[in-house]
């Protein structure tokens, strides 16, 4: 199996049994550097976040998808669009630090926006992302994916 095949992934809706994998990712100091979750996040907090993600999906206010490696079934991150109000949503994502710099998140975002109407039932005109100004990797990623800097946000128009 080639290295490329090892990084092939699928996206699927998050579920409660993903709690441990997501918690492990969020506890990683390299992930915490630019993430907006508290450093002392508990597994219970993550379970509650997942419950909220599931409820937002059913209320057509967002979706969170996990990134699953095809080769192993391992959850290596998540991506979501949430707080969908009046055609505008917020983007959030995290990736296991083991996979930083491998181009996975760009492929994830490309897939998310390519299949947006499949993943997000609510109509969307734009997606915003809040990024720490020191997070050059995420800024580069968002730029490659068509986001534009606007005030303190990064914006992608999708309609």
Where are these regions (language model features)?
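Conserved GNAT-fold acetyl-CoA-binding loop/helix
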Residues: 30-52, 63
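Short loop/turn motifs at secondary-structure junctions and domain boundaries
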Residues: 55-60
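Generic structural signal for well-ordered alpha-helical scaffold segments
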Residues: 51-54, 117
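Acyl-donor (CoA/ACP) binding surface of acyl/acetyltransferases
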Residues: 1-28, 64, 68-159
């Amino acid at each position: 199996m080639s290295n490329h095949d090892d990084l092939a992934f699928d996206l699927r809706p998050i579920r409660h049994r993903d709690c441990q994998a997501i918690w492990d990712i969020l506890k990683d100091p390299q992930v915490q550097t630019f993430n907006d979750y508290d450093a002392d996040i508990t597994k219970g907090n993550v379970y509650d976040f997942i419950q909220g993600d599931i409820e937002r999906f059913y209320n057509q206010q967002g979706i969170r998808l996990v990134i699953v490696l095809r080769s192993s079934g391992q959850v290596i991150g998540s991506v979501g669009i949430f707080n969908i109000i009046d055609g505008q949503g917020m983007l959030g994502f995290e990736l296991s630090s083991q996979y930083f710099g491998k181009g996975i998140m760009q492929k994830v975002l490309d897939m998310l926006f390519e299949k947006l109407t499949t993943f997000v039932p609510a109509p969307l005109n734009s997606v915003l992302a809040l990024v720490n100004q020191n997070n050059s990797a995420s800024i580069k990623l968002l730029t490659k994916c068509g986001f534009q800097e606007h005030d303190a946000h990064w914006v992608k128009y999708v309609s």
